[in-house]
Amino acid sequence: MIQKVQIRTNPLITFSAVLHIGACAAVFWQVWLWPWALGVVIADHLLLVGCGLLPRSRTLGANLSRLPDAAAARGEIALTIDDGPDPLVTPQVLDLLDHFAAKASFFCVGTAAQGHPDLCREIMRRGHSIENHTQHHRYNFSLSGPRSLHREIAWAQSTLTNITGHKPHFFRAPAGLRNLFLDTVLIRLNLRLVSWTRRGYDTINRDPEKVLKLLLHNLRAGDILVLHDGNAALTRNGVPVILEILPLLLASVRGAGLHCVTLRAAMEAVVDVPAAPVPEPDFPLPHLIPAARGATL
């Protein structure tokens, strides 16, 4: 059965609230203390913003940046693929994964999924998982308040569930950036935040060798890797970086005695529960072709 997410109290946020109350009380007690109180409040806000700019930080709440020890002991790593599905790139990624008998977790954007529902279902059919990467993938996501965060994530949750018939269990913020409100929103939606152990910056880095080096440097069991099938940077030959490096990456993983699994498989306590799908129009899967769209940041 699915483990329910327990309500958590973040010590930093509690401290921040106490700090604000203390600053107000100090000014009320002695008005001349206002410059000091203002400075303390500003410093606190800068700290909170800074924590949100660190994708792997746990300061603002629970954050999975590595697989559990049990998964690492089994020689598992998690390959996560963001920003899709892309009708030109994703089918080729799926074929490469099949060739190496590797599984991946696709963090899909709701609008992209709506445009290619059959491709989402194909991802699931081949034994991979689809997780939540927001509805629109806006880069100002981390500037949103609680209501906006909830609406954007819940919208994607509904979109992806209706298309695939399975609820996402994990969430990743655009570019990994977040704020102090996100943890509470994810608790309410019963989602778990996932960042990564290492990434290759393959949306902006056009050099496959550099991307591969970043992903393989000190690679070990339990790592979570990030690549992109959507918004993929193109090599000088016009090939999406993920397609250039994925065979080499998967071969290296196999050579190291490791194997790629979905996040759901690695997290043994999380079990997939089918949900009633909402009928969607059928679109034929695109043919596999080498060309791909240009990269965007």
Protein language model regions, located:
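N-terminal membrane-anchoring alpha-helices
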Residues: 1-65
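A cross-domain feature marking catalytic cores of carbohydrate-active enzymes
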Residues: 81-83, 108-110, 132-134, 173-175, ...
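CE4/NodB-like, metal-dependent polysaccharide N-deacetylase domain
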Residues: 94-108, 128-129, 145-179, 184-192, ...
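A short, flexible beta-alpha/helix-coil linker loop
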Residues: 136-139, 199-200, 231-234
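Active-site beta->alpha N-cap acidic-glycine motif
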Residues: 52-141, 155, 159, 259
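Acidic-and-aromatic substrate-binding clefts and catalytic sites of carbohydrate-active enzymes
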Residues: 84-88, 108-117, 138-147, 172-180, ...
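C-terminal domain-boundary segment and adjacent tail
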Residues: 50-53, 57-72, 237-297
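His/Asp/Glu-enriched short active-site or ligand-binding loop at hydrolase and phosphoryl-transfer sites
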Residues: 177, 182-218, 258-269, 287
